Amino acid sequence: MSAGTHCGPPGNRAPPFARLCCVSAALGMLWSPACLAFNLDVDKLTVYSGPEGSYFGYSLDFYIPDARTASVLVGAPKANTSQPDIVEGGAVYYCPWPSERSAQCKQIPFDTTNNRKIRVNGTKEPIEFKSNQWFGATVRAHKGKVVACAPLYHWRTLKPNPAKDPVGTCYVAIQNFSAYAEHSPCRNSNADPEGQGYCQAGFSLDFYKNGDLIVGGPGSFYWQGQVITVSIADIIANYSFKDILRKLAAEKQTDVAPASYDDSYLGYSVAAGEFTGDSQQELVAGIPRGAQNFGYVSIINSTDMTFIQNFTGEQMASYFGYTVVVSDVNNDGMDDILVGAPLFMEREFESNPREVGQVYLYLQASALLFQDPQVLTGTETFGRFGSSVAHLGDLNQDGYNDIAIGVPFAGKDQRGKVLIYNGNPRGLHSKPSQVLQGIWGSQTIPSGFGFSLRGDADIDKNDYPDLLVGAFGKGKVAVYRARPVVTVDAQLLLHPMIINLENKTCQIPEFPTPVACFSVRVCASIAGQSISNTIALLAEVQLDFLKQKGAIKRTLFLHNHQSHFTFPFVMKQQKSLHCQDFMVYLRDETEFRDKLSPINISLNYSLDDSTFKDSLEVKPILNHYRDNVVTEQAHILVDCGEDNLCVPDLKLSARPDKHQIIIGDENHLMLIINARNEGEGAYEAELFVIIPEEADYVGIERNNKGLRPLSCEYKMENVTRMVVCDLGNPMVTGTNFSLGLRFAVPRLEKTNMSINFDLQIRSSNKDNPDSNFERVQINITAIAQVEIRGVSHPPQIVLPIHNWEPEKKPHKEEEVGPLVEHIYELHNIGPSTISDSILDVGWPFSARDEFLLYIFHLQTLGPLQCQTNPEINPQDIKPAASPEDTPELSAFLRNATIPHLVRKRDVPVVQLHRQSPARILNCTNIDCLQISCAVGRLGGGESAVLKVRSRLWAHTFLKRKNDHYALASLVSFEVKKMPYKEQPAKLPAGSTAVKTSVIWATPNVSFSIPLWVIILAILLGLLVLAILTLALWKCGFFDRARPPQDEMTDREQLTSDKTPEA
């Protein structure tokens, strides 16, 4: 029996009652129940209430003196009574069953007297102290006998300097509470802590099966503790109100032990059971602080009170032995022991241990031989799992005893919980079958729901044991009644179990087309203790239930064309088989593909609650440990031999139409796949092609007569992309065909040397369903064609320049010489991209400290970063505004292909000299300025352009008249890197020269003619012409001879038809 909070004065050793304190105010964590309710009824709950603050419910028991009478006993150790001058002496309440509003719980008058007194020096002084004695902290009933104790009862010792010692006392009630007797086994002359002065007799309490009493006194002998047994008959026979110090001859007690056993608390909990193989019970006592605070439980011989066997806890300060209970859990005829350790700490993480509590079950294998314990562990921090453990009896009538475990400070607002564990042949189920939730909160102390438990009694006479749960912090006791358990034995019978789609023997109403069908028979029988003769179930049959939601159900009920049907199923006699038949048909073959997987049919059932009237009786419940779902399978007949099992032999091969693709290219490729079946039919055969992340599915090849145009679709499962092609249902024996799948591969920048397509044929066949795994590897390469080209603008300079002379020390750009621009273009033809290149220019800058082409500005287009060595414009000449580009130059800068950037212009005023070839000036014979450019990323078809604006240093060349020169700049490039994981073995490089010619021309000589000379010449010319004309006229040069004319006009001659006469 679990204990409560006790207080009292300290002795000359450590204070005892602080160590015996068991009420905790620690916070509990929320705990979610592991399962649904089983057969303790939580709806028709009976609740008894006691006075506020009385700790009503701290202890409790059933009181069943005979087969016709049942009631509940409840201890309230802080209740006030009618005893004069006694404050919170405590009481035990009698609560009648069945509970009615008019029937209140009443105090049982175990003791109605004040403190007894003695005369000391002429003054009456109390010899006992009943205030705050915690009467009712323990209460036990055995048939018609009831014992209740006050472990904090004090008495005045018979010493010269008397002390007030908490010896504890108990009261016995018999004959339906008509006779009472007190027994205080530790109230004697052996006082003080070293004796039995701090005994606290009645701290724990139990009965042997013969009715003898076991009393625990954990404070005796410097809190070594002790256990006392006594016969109820001896207590009654030898009781005398006046005889305070009374020793019963038949009383048995454990003796004092060596000092090393101090502070052990023997008797903290007690129970009785049979463990030696004889017919006489032994007692079991918890010693939670023994064994160096590890705690242990002892089996003690009931005859001579000697210790027989110990069970030791596994963790220090876990309070192993806080509770002990005896029960034959596995129904093998031998008693088993359960031990609570509510302060056990789970050390999954050493830095953050959790106090969760444990309960240990020791199954007895033979006399004094026990199996290794089964351990149940709590889940809620500070819930105090194992503070109370109760033997319930066979709660669900399955032949094995069940156990309740209290977790009084668990759950929401520390409302408490009670966990029900059912027994089985191996012990207890590891998961609770039911979790009772505390329903009372408290703003002061926790309600303590589950701190006290009592079972193994049938209060409502329905042949099922019931459970009492106390919540002392709220002053409540709840009666949970067990519901009758109905065990259903159900089955599904299918005929035939193999369906021939060609055998269409059923007719759908209102449809002329026959269909293939089979029958479904639902049969069930019921069994259970004390259940009604008529039990109604609500049953549901689901056809093809493993098909996912939204998928086509292959079978339907003939009467409603649905894949499920719910119906009432009434059974009127236990163990009698009841059946009901249904016809089921298959859809047309064109409506579904799956012919191989079984047609799974399920029957699930529940009790039809509508048939149970709302009465005081508790409703039955289905057996928690019997599955309420029954399944069966039917199969479709396939052409797979006598065994109806198809074993295909699928083969697969594949090859690409190209074995290499280039990064940056369009990269269209086709996989040519051959699929064949050399075995039996493969059902729902499909080709799966896993698409690499670099590729995209384009479609199936339909223009090649040698390739079959199958039905294929793109799918995505999670992050896997695939193409799935239907190969037939079934893919029959001897199938052999090829198909082509087209893909585009645009994303190759981050890939390795190759990409892989994974292929496999899969079917729904059970045996050998898949083909070989095929992997097609495509190699990846990077190729970039890069060219460098340049142009000079203008391509030649003609000296001298008309009406212009250079300055010896120019200050402006225009004073230097004619403009010369060189433009260089680095062009990536592709298809791959280049990401890191170098462009170098050697520029004809000077010779013998004389400038040649003097640079003023560098202009770039595209990803270019340039620097020069030495710096440009070293004379710090003021540059001119940048001139606008000519159309030819603009086109060049737009990457246009220009055959002739600059046309050859006419020179009407000068004649070009052709006497000698030009002398070439380049970096091999002059001083060059170096231009170095870093080129960034260039994709296929992209360019980078460098434009160098300079002036011909005219002064240098005018000193060398008639010498022809060609000024050449040399531009080169080298690709350093491409933006891919794998680099090609050789990267592009190249160079070219750009020339500007300097040539000379000699001007024509022209004479100046006076104006009067020109006028005189014109007049003289006119005079000569006039004289000549006059001479010719005089000579008759202008006269003409004409033929003779008649009177006929020209028109008449032209229109006359006659020939003129001679």
From Swiss-Prot:
Record: glycosylation sites: 80, 121, 176, 238, 301, 310, 503, 600, 604, 718, 736, 752, 779, 895, 922, 1004
Extent of the FG-GAP repeats: 41-104, 121-182, 187-239, 252-305, 306-371, 372-430, 434-497
A GO biological-process term: positive regulation of transcription by RNA polymerase II
Sequence ranges on the Extracellular membrane side: 36-1010
Gene3D superfamilies: Bicelle-embedded integrin alpha(iib) transmembrane segment, Integrin alpha, N-terminal, Integrin domains. Chain A, domain 2, ntegrin, alpha v. Chain A, domain 3, ntegrin, alpha v. Chain A, domain 4
Residues where Ca(2+) 1 binds: E274, T276, D278, E282
Motif (Cell attachment site): 454-456
Residues annotated as signal peptide: 1-35
One annotated GO molecular function: metal ion binding
Record localization: Membrane; Cell membrane
Disulfide-bonded cysteines: C95-C105, C149-C170, C186-C199, C506-C517, C523-C579, C640-C646, C712-C725, C866-C923, C928-C933
UniProt GO cellular component terms: apical part of cell; cell surface; dendritic spine membrane; endoplasmic reticulum; glutamatergic synapse; integrin complex; perikaryon; plasma membrane
Residue ranges crossing the lipid bilayer per the database entry: 1011-1031
Positions on the Cytoplasmic side per record topology: 1032-1062
Observed phenotype of the null mutant: Mice display renal agenesis and dysgenesis. This is associated with a reduced expression of Gdnf that is similarly found in mice lacking Npnt. Adult mice also display increased susceptibility to glomerular capillary destruction upon mechanical stress. Mice lacking Itga8 also have difficulty balancing associated with structural defects in the inner ear where utricular hair cells lack stereocilia.
Major location (coarse): membrane
PANTHER family per the UniProt record, alphabetical: INTEGRIN ALPHA, INTEGRIN ALPHA-8
Its biological purpose: Integrin alpha-8/beta-1 functions in the genesis of kidney and probably of other organs by regulating the recruitment of mesenchymal cells into epithelial structures. It recognizes the sequence R-G-D in a wide array of ligands including TNC, FN1, SPP1 TGFB1, TGFB3 and VTN. NPNT is probably its functional ligand in kidney genesis. Neuronal receptor for TNC it mediates cell-cell interactions and regulates neurite outgrowth of sensory and motor neurons.
Protein name per UniProt: Integrin alpha-8
Protein's organism: Mus musculus (Mouse)
Gene of this entry: Itga8
